[in-house]
């Protein structure tokens, strides 16, 4: 089903059958602005890294306001939908698709599709093998020098990304925005403590219920 974003009349998404989260994610970003970015943080020509790009809702939002986007999505079903939505909106030259999982180590992992959400799982659970790398390796691979917005939504694996990144590379990120859930666990405090070394940090929610983290560079 083709869904047109009401605010634009031009941005469209191919909503998948049996994936109820697709439309929810689009509305969270385009209507509710849960990541608190709006156009003020999305400068034309700026750089956005979208970790956990899913079907491309945030990536297309950032590209709509002129940013260059690195859309990171390892799960094959989401990856296919991401590429399709980028093509539907003629953004192939503005959004770069990166089929990796970002964590605190380099190697491989099994990732499972859970109705639109995806998460790294134990090897005895069915899923797809994907390449894994730390944020530092990703920055080196794509020669990232400065990031206007780093968005993270990886179903509880946010701490591994932040704790596995160097202070030097976190300082390259002007604004970091992420969603977390109960799977983040009590590592939330450790993660925000590290972020506070380089950024002002604001949180909403708790590790038991989930919530949001927003951080902007000192």
Could you say what each language-model-derived stretch is?
Residues 1-218:
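Phosphate/nucleotide-binding beta-alpha loop and adjacent structural elements of enzyme active sites
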């Amino acid at each position: 089903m083709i869904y047109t974003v009401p605010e634009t009349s031009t941005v469209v998404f191919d909503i998948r059958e049996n994936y109820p989260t697709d439309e929810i994610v689009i509305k969270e970003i385009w209507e509710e602005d849960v990541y608190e970015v709006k156009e003020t943080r999305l400068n034309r020509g700026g750089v956005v890294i979208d970790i956990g790009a899913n079907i491309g809702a945030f990536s297309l939002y950032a590209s709509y306001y002129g940013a260059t986007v690195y859309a990171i999505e390892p799960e094959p079903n989401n990856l296919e939908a991401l590429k399709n939505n980028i093509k539907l909106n003629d953004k192939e030259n503005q959004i770069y698709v990166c089929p990796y999982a970002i964590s605190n180590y380099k190697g491989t992992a099994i990732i499972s599709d859970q109705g639109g959400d995806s998460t790294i799982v134990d090897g005895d659970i069915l899923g797809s093998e994907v390449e894994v790398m730390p944020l530092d390796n990703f920055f080196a691979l794509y020669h990232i020098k400065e990031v206007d917005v780093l968005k993270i939504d990886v179903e509880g694996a946010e701490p591994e990304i932040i704790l596995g990144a160097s202070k030097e590379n976190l300082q390259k990120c002007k604004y970091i925005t992420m969603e977390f859930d109960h799977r983040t666990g009590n590592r939330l405090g450790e993660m925000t403590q590290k972020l506070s070394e380089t950024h002002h940090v604001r949180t909403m929610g708790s590790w038991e219920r989930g919530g949001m983290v927003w951080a902007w560079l000192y």
